[in-house]
Each structure stands twice: as structure tokens, then as C-alpha cells.
Amino acid sequence: MNSVTVSHAPYTITYHDDWEPVMSQLVEFYNEVASWLLRDETSPIPDKFFIQLKQPLRNKRVCVCGIDPYPKDGTGVPFESPNFTKKSIKEIASSISRLTGVIDYKGYNLNIIDGVIPWNYYLSCKLGETKSHAIYWDKISKLLLQHITKHVSVLYCLGKTDYSNIRAKLESPVTTIVGYHPAARDRQFEKDRSFEIINVLLELDNKAPINWAQGFIY
């Protein structure tokens, strides 16, 4: 692991080598906006903004991308809910349960699945207010997601409205699926078969499929 310093909390960002090409720009962009972000109480706390940068990218095939953290109790790991109470991760788990037949589980975490990096486009929000920090993170969000897409084969974005123009923001030719958000109304996410489709796309690209059942916690 490497680390860099920034002028505001969290003061130190620890990161895996695979993120090195974007770190100097990240530091510059963060120092420009941090004082604005940090006027608010945030979800997650600043020490957890950049926790996913500890993840390597060279072994990732799929990025599952949400829009921003839970407005309360964000852990810095997208979709993670240690007490398994958040609607989004419960819906994701039930979708994978239907796909795999696994039923006796106590939780689900995308971050423990080989080949997958869960990501949030915006890395924080004001406590209790989704998308409230979008304007501050925008340059950083674009920089980091572009870097991720240089490594993965499939980018799966959760949120049809939020991601309607995502392809315009990406430079790498990555296969992109834009699906319903797990919290979408009318149970639209239930009918979404993106997790299955991702594995078909990986096979077409001669890559190993994702074992989605690995995310279950018992």
C-alpha cells in the first residue's frame, strides 16, 4: 500500500499501486473542494471516503456502481450494510438468491466477491441527503471511474436516471449496463436480470464468470 497526504480530513489517503496513475490529480481536485464538503456532517465519515482505493484493480472484471453512499451509516464500501438493514443491499441479495438458489443467508457484500469492485460515483453525501455532494465530487468521480473502466470488462450502473448519459463521461471502451436502482419503485429491480447478463458478457469476452454467491454472509 502507498499513501499520499491531503490538506483536509482524512489528511492521508492509503491506496493500492493500481491507483497510482490518478493519485496526483485526485489530491489536487480534493484539495480544491474538501473545505466545501467538510462543512457538512457526512456519510460516510471523511476517514472512509477513499477506503475503496485500497482495492487492487488488476484482478477486477466487473464494477458495480451506485450513485452515492447511504445517506446514513455509509461505511465507505458501496452497498455495504453490516446489520443488513438497507433496502438496496437486501434487494441485491434477493436478486442473487433467485439466481443462485441460496436462501439461508444473513447478509450480502459485493466487496468480498472475486473479480468485483463495488463503487459509488459520488464518494459522500451530507448526512441524510442523497446526491447533496454531487457538485463537489464531479471532477473526482469522473477521474476515478474512468480509471476503473480501464481495468474492468463490464461496468454495471444501478440507476437508469442517474446514469442515462454515463457513456459520454467515459473514455475507455467498456461494456456498460445501465439497470434499475435496487430501491426503484414498482419492484422494477426484481425483473432486472443484469447479474445473469454480466456473466454472459464476460464469457463472450473470454473472461471467467462472476460467482455471485460468494457475496453471501451466513
UniProtKB/Swiss-Prot annotation:
The keyword Iron does not apply. The keyword Nuclease does not apply. It catalyses: Hydrolyzes single-stranded DNA or mismatched double-stranded DNA and polynucleotides, releasing free uracil. Changing residue 187 to V: About 60% loss of processive DNA synthesis but unaffected UDG activity. GO terms for molecular function: DNA binding; uracil DNA N-glycosylase activity. GO terms for biological process: DNA repair. It is an enzyme of class 3 (hydrolase). InterPro entries: Ura-DNA_Glyclase_AS, Uracil-DNA_glycosylase-like_sf. Changing residue 126 to V: About 80% loss of processive DNA synthesis but unaffected UDG activity. Keywords: DNA damage, DNA repair, DNA-binding, Hydrolase. Changing residue 160 to V: About 90% loss of processive DNA synthesis but unaffected UDG activity. Gene3D superfamilies: Uracil-DNA glycosylase-like domain. Its EC number is 3.2.2.27. Plays an essential role in viral replication as a component of the DNA polymerase processivity factor. Excises uracil residues from the DNA which can arise as a result of misincorporation of dUMP residues by DNA polymerase or due to deamination of cytosine. Belongs to the uracil-DNA glycosylase (UDG) superfamily. UNG family. Homodimer. Interacts with protein OPG148. Component of the Uracil-DNA glycosylase(UDG)-OPG148-polymerase complex; OPG148 and UDG form a heterodimeric processivity factor that associates with OPG71 to form the processive polymerase holoenzyme. This is Uracil-DNA glycosylase.
